[in-house]
């Protein structure tokens, strides 16, 4: 497999082709056993093969600190063997992987929601983790144990006389040592959705106050109408005023100051420290920066690009996340394209500031039926417009038979010689188009994944087709010439 690196806002391979990745999350958060959390990395060859056949060429391979280092400096090699087995399967079927150190609510123990850190690394200053009562994320909002555990992690408090982040960095070095030369390695996603700790609780309270103030004072909010919707059982409709991106940003801006402080302070210091630790082991792999939990709502991400004493990391990308407020509920059919679109517009501004490529690390979610797929298609079109790669959240048993696959299994550019100008999908008329500017002659073709049988191909250059075994899909290989090249696939 070709090594992937970065150039400005593009992913490129060793031939200099622009690469686009259509991916999915495979995340092992573990589950509660009788005494301890159990981790299995339960992704087999049949699954990886099917992912490849469905056009997925990247997986975000999620694991946790707890799974890897259950005791200080004692690493679970048996578990890492399981991770490596999945990585080997990815290579076999032409799929890249990047390693995600996942967490939700900092950690999770018996009977508790959450995942991430081992119990010994949870320094809560005496606060106790509480069971969830309403929504899984409430520990972020008012859970003192979760908030204090994050505070102590970001402040690099000591356990047994050693700073927590020293343990974390050495754990990452151990992982990097094992995977540094793997042919399918894409990169290192060092920390999932970093949360600011006690300041995160303050942000939540500021956002609640901002909602109340906006509803009471902004003329765009008809309080009588909104109250009527709630009283008549249409509470979801009461949120419609916040489909207005300007109004939504007005509410979320209440948290801007505290998130800026976190991004440029504790998080930036942490990500630089962790990336440097990995780079002391290997120059391979792309360093992946994530936004904080609250930037999933569109609060600006302000961390500078990863650097070492002012020297910029050469291989780095930005991996933003965002979801609609209705995600993973029966009300997902009421998802707001304009609201989530504005969040990704803010992420686009962050990309331009950082001048790095983007892979949307998490997006999408799930619901019942098909009347929410308009939102999935909207997001895919937005990513395509920005030439963004993405990893859908997340794989579960039955995903590949779910109606959402009519959106996720799609025709996409894979490796393009030169610069992509534009690629679009017209779902109504069944037309995919690609335009690219080839800067020189290449000794390899441009490649496009065609997801099913097609009616015709129009191309300004010679091309060949390579069948994808066991499917109606094919790889379109275009022998482009310097200058403008166009492709149209009709279904």
Annotate the PLM regions:
Residues 6-22, 26-285, 291-295:
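Active-site mouth of glycoside hydrolases
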Residues 6-9, 42-48, 293-309, 340-348, ...:
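Alpha-helical scaffolding within the catalytic cores
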Residues 48-53, 179-180, 304-314, 348-355, ...:
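Acidic (Asp/Glu)-rich catalytic clusters
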Residues 226-254, 305-336:
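Aromatic- and acid-rich polysaccharide-binding/catalytic face
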Residues 315-323, 329, 340-407:
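Substrate-binding cleft of secreted/luminal carbohydrate-active enzymes
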Residues 372-459:
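Extended, alpha-helix-rich binding/interface surfaces that flank or overlap catalytic cores
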Residues 462-473:
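Solvent-exposed beta-strand/loop surfaces of large extracellular or lumenal domains
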Residues 476-491:
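Surface-exposed interaction regions enriched in Ser/Thr/Asp/Glu
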